């Protein structure tokens, strides 16, 4: 009888202690909420559940391994402090991973959670194009830095110092996506255990919004922050999306803090991403920023020659040279033109000649040869640099006016067939020597002034 009474008394004491500790935990939660604020408390600390206190060792539970590890690193010291303020006998606070639907089930489900993360991982990424490998990428002066940086990231098992993040930028169809796919394929084929997520900024935004609606935001955070390499294509599309930018910012920081690699692409440099928060633009420029410039004739010809070789067909080199010379907008359009010529030849049963290629692509060639006038260049450059169109003709030599004027002269020489005297005449009657000086000055600055180079590349795309 005495043993039974003692057992019953012991159970009552335990229940009383458990109840007291539950009250203490509720008080601590209030303090944590006040100390950290709504955002941190709601995202991380509100999901903690009190389990027990055995000999001064407090045990809490978290729903996932990721949340547990994050709290252990960032918030555990403050939790312990508050608990010791309430109960000096407490010597430690630990966290286990428990399904919150059954807080009495004290099991570590680390392996199960790892499996769930892996099973849900594939839907994070966009499909990879099997054609986009390093072997199929033609390297030339406009893209050699971007290629070398991408290759280095793929080959390294750790983030590259000075290249994290790797930020690739350039116009549409110049090879940014190709390089990002190539990084992923290289890692996959090398049997690396590194986990990769490649997706567009639009898909990142969609996944985030979906997670908010379904109240799975913690799973979203865990999945994206558990990868070894995160690659986000066309990041300019998060422009103006405040909540998406907030989550992208925190994901970026979390991965950098964990020494994980990021690869980001956009159609312009970080500093030119209008509608993107300054703190994000700053971080995008932390690592290596590599631009992919417009293709040269030699690069376009090399791309066509490689594609023809892969297709296993014979096309006269003069036809390839014709395409490379006349289709300058982007690689995607160039390859599309070649495919059209080859398809026509196969379906109709005729050989590929210079004349047949010219006929087949007549509409495309006309579009690529749209007339760019001197007046159009002057107007667009004036708008871009926020000066008056009359400043293009004036004799004023203020730097804020002279530099845009030189840029306009440079673009006039590059984008039109006008002679130097004709260009000079359209700029307030200046002589050809002034035009030559302006062109040389801009060519010199392009090599050293990345901001000016970006501006000119953007203006060129706007004018064509």
Swiss-Prot record:
Binding site for ATP: 173, 175-177
Ranges where the record places region Domain III, AAA+ region: 127-345
Gene: dnaA
PROSITE patterns per the UniProt record, alphabetical: DNAA
Name of the protein in its database record: Chromosomal replication initiator protein DnaA
InterPro entries the UniProt entry points to: AAA+_ATPase, Chromosome_initiator_DnaA, Chromosome_initiator_DnaA-like, Chromosome_initiator_DnaA_CS, DnaA_C, DnaA_dom, DnaA_N_dom, DnaA_N_sf
CDD domains assigned to the protein according to its UniProt record, in alphabetical order: AAA, Bac_DnaA_C
Positions of the UniProt region annotated as Domain I, interacts with DnaA modulators: 1-90
One of the record's GO cellular component terms: cytoplasm
Subcellular location: Cytoplasm
Entry keyword annotation includes ATP-binding: yes
Entry comment, domain topic: Domain I is involved in oligomerization and binding regulators, domain II is flexibile and of varying length in different bacteria, domain III forms the AAA+ region, while domain IV binds dsDNA.
One GO biological process term: DNA replication initiation
Sequence similarity: Belongs to the DnaA family.
SUPFAM superfamilies: P-loop containing nucleoside triphosphate hydrolases (SSF52540), TrpR-like (SSF48295)
SMART domains: AAA, Bac_DnaA_C
Keywords from the named record: ATP-binding, Cytoplasm, DNA replication, DNA-binding, Lipid-binding, Nucleotide-binding
Region (Domain IV, binds dsDNA), start-end ranges: 346-464
Function statement: Plays an essential role in the initiation and regulation of chromosomal replication. ATP-DnaA binds to the origin of replication (oriC) to initiate formation of the DNA replication initiation complex once per cell cycle. Binds the DnaA box (a 9 base pair repeat at the origin) and separates the double-stranded (ds)DNA. Forms a right-handed helical filament on oriC DNA; dsDNA binds to the exterior of the filament while single-stranded (ss)DNA is stabiized in the filament's interior.
Broad class of where this protein is predominantly found: cytoplasm
Key word ATP-binding present: yes
Chain intervals for the UniProt region annotation (Domain II): 90-126
Lineage of the organism: Bacteria, Pseudomonadati, Pseudomonadota, Alphaproteobacteria, Rickettsiales
Subunit text: Oligomerizes as a right-handed, spiral filament on DNA at oriC.
Protein source organism: Ehrlichia chaffeensis (strain ATCC CRL-10679 / Arkansas)
A single GO molecular function term of this UniProt record: lipid binding
């Amino acid at each position: 009888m005495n043993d039974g009474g003692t057992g019953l008394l012991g159970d009552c004491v335990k229940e009383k202690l458990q109840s007291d500790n539950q009250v203490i935990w509720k008080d601590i939660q209030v303090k944590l909420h006040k100390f950290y604020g709504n955002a941190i408390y709601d995202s991380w600390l509100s999901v903690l559940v009190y389990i027990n206190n055995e000999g001064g060792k407090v045990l809490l539970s978290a729903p996932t391994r990721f949340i547990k590890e994050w709290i252990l690193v960032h918030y555990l010291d403050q939790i312990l402090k508050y608990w010791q303020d309430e109960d000096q006998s407490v010597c430690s606070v630990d966290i286990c991973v428990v399904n919150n639907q059954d807080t009495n089930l004290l099991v570590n489900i680390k392996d199960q959670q790892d499996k769930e993360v892996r099973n849900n991982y594939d839907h994070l990424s966009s499909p990879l194009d099997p054609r986009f490998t390093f072997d199929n990428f033609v390297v030339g002066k406009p893209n050699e830095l971007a290629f070398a940086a991408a290759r280095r990231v793929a080959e390294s098992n750790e983030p590259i110092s000075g290249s994290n993040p790797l930020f690739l930028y350039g116009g549409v169809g110049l090879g940014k996506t190709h390089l990002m796919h190539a990084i992923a394929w290289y890692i996959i084929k090398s049997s690396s255990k590194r986990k990769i997520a490649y997706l567009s900024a639009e898909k990142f935004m969609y996944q985030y919004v979906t997670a908010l609606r379904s109240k799975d935001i913690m799973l979203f955070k865990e999945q994206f922050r558990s990868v070894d390499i995160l690659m986000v294509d066309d990041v300019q599309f998060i422009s103006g999306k405040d909540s998406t930018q907030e989550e992208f910012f925190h994901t970026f920081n979390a991965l950098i803090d964990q020494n994980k690699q990021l690869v980001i692409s956009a159609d312009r440099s970080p500093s030119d991403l209008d509608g993107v928060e300054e703190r994000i633009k700053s971080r995008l420029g932390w690592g290596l920023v590599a631009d992919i410039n417009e293709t040269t004739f030699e690069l376009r010809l090399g791309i066509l020659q490689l594609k023809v070789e892969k297709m296993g067909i014979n096309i006269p080199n003069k036809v390839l040279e014709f395409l490379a010379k006349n289709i300058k907008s982007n690689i995607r359009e160039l390859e599309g033109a070649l495919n059209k010529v080859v398809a026509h030849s196969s379906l109709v049963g005729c050989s590929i000649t210079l004349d047949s290629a010219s006929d087949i692509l007549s509409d495309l060639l006309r579009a690529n040869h749209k007339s760019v006038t001197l007046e159009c260049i002057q107007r667009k450059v004036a708008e871009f640099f926020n000066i008056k169109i009359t400043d293009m003709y004036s004799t004023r030599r203020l730097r804020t006016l002279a530099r845009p004027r030189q840029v306009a002269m440079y673009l006039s020489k590059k984008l039109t067939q006008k002679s130097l005297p004709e260009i000079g005449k359209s700029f307030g009657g200046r002589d050809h020597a002034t035009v030559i000086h302006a062109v040389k000055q801009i060519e010199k600055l392009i090599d050293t002034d990345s901001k000016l180079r970006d501006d000119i590349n953007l203006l060129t795309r706007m004018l064509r």
